[in-house]
Amino acid sequence: MIKLKELLELNEMTYNDGASEKHQDKIDRPITLFEDISISLQPFPENTSKKTLEEVKYLSEIEEDVDYVRENDKVKESFGKLHEEFELEYNEDEAGKYLKESSKYIMELKYKFQRPRPHQIADFYGIDLNGVDLDSMKTPSYPSGHATQGYLLGMIYSERYPEYRKEFMKLGDDIAESRIVGKAHFPSDKKAGIELAEKLFQNRK
């Protein structure tokens, strides 16, 4: 039986105490590709909510696929391979700049919300997620940065090469979904990441 005190502590749980110097540098990064706007998202479901517990249980039932998670970890390289497959020109510097500047917004929101990662909530309930541990998973959970960046580049290249829209958007979704398969994100993190990507795409200069 979970005690009220424990539930209150769970609801107050955060990912950590704040941004590292490295992550703060990303938050302070100047912007040149996007309009100077303030982007907001709806808060994530509370840690003690039925929705969050349902998401944790959903993650616990996903079959492990380490290869899929690792293959989709490097966003810039993944899109480079798809360009190469279709013999399309790929400006790696441009892609890198979009990833760097989008990370400013991602990090701002991650540290604003400070949502715990799924394994932190799962541990409270005694649920073993058996997730994949990668260096790119060392930030607060909400929103998913991979979902944001995968969908952002997917939309940019779909606009540029509309005949390959299906393939670019599938790759963007694979990058986003790989973080769910790796148990690194809640499905609601992915949804918020896609919403952020759409806002960034719409506010390009």
Where are these regions (language model features)?
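Generic structural signal for hydrophobic core residues of well-folded globular domains
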Residues: Y157-R160, L200, R204
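Charge-dense, intrinsically disordered terminal/linker segments
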Residues: M1-M13, Q202-K205
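Hydrophobic alpha-helical bundle signature of multipass membrane enzymes
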Residues: M13-V181
